[in-house]
């Protein structure tokens, strides 16, 4: 009977919680702002963790790159903080990536809304022409 979650998934969940707390409490750089950790992917050998983040209230590409760079420079420090929370032999190396899925989701949602509105207007036009 297979397990519902493998070890790398459990470590990823624990790292996500620990990193969220560590970034909020330990990172004092105002350029980073409010960070939302969307996902953490840990390799099967538990050596590397990819952390996907977004920044609340930041839309500027340059500011996003700066914030990701700051987080990557602090990755060693954050790894040390996380290692104190986790009870595993070695803590995965951390690398931060900007998560573009939220932005893509908003674009797709607006496209769908626009298509629905156009479809409704075409159906109303067709209904109006049939009555005449």
From Swiss-Prot:
Keyword Membrane among UniProt keywords: no
Top-level lineage group: Bacteria
InterPro entries reported in the protein's UniProt record: KH_dom-like_a/b, RbfA, RbfA_dom_sf, Ribosome-bd_factorA_CS
Gene Ontology cellular-component annotations: cytosol
GO molecular function, one term: ribosomal small subunit binding
Keywords from the named record: Cytoplasm, Ribosome biogenesis
A GO BP entry: maturation of SSU-rRNA
PROSITE patterns: RBFA
Family of this protein: Belongs to the RbfA family.
Subunit structure: Monomer. Binds 30S ribosomal subunits, but not 50S ribosomal subunits or 70S ribosomes.
Function: One of several proteins that assist in the late maturation steps of the functional core of the 30S ribosomal subunit. Associates with free 30S ribosomal subunits (but not with 30S subunits that are part of 70S ribosomes or polysomes). Required for efficient processing of 16S rRNA. May interact with the 5'-terminal helix region of 16S rRNA.
Protein's UniProt name: Ribosome-binding factor A
Species assigned in the record: Teredinibacter turnerae (strain ATCC 39867 / T7901)
Gene: rbfA
């Amino acid at each position: 009977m297979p397990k519902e979650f493998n070890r790398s998934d459990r470590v990823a969940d624990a790292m996500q919680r620990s990193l969220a707390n560590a970034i909020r409490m330990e990172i004092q750089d105002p350029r980073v702002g409010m960070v939302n950790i969307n996902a953490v992917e840990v390799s099967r050998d538990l050596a590397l963790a990819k952390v996907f983040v977004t920044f609340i209230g930041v839309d500027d590409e340059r500011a996003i790159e700066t914030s990701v760079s700051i987080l990557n420079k602090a990755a060693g420090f954050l790894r040390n903080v996380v290692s104190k929370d986790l009870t595993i032999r070695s803590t995965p190396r951390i690398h931060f990536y900007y998560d573009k899925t939220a932005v893509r989701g908003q674009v797709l949602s607006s496209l769908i809304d626009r298509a629905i509105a156009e479809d409704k207007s075409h159906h109303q036009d067709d209904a109006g022409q049939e009555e005449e």
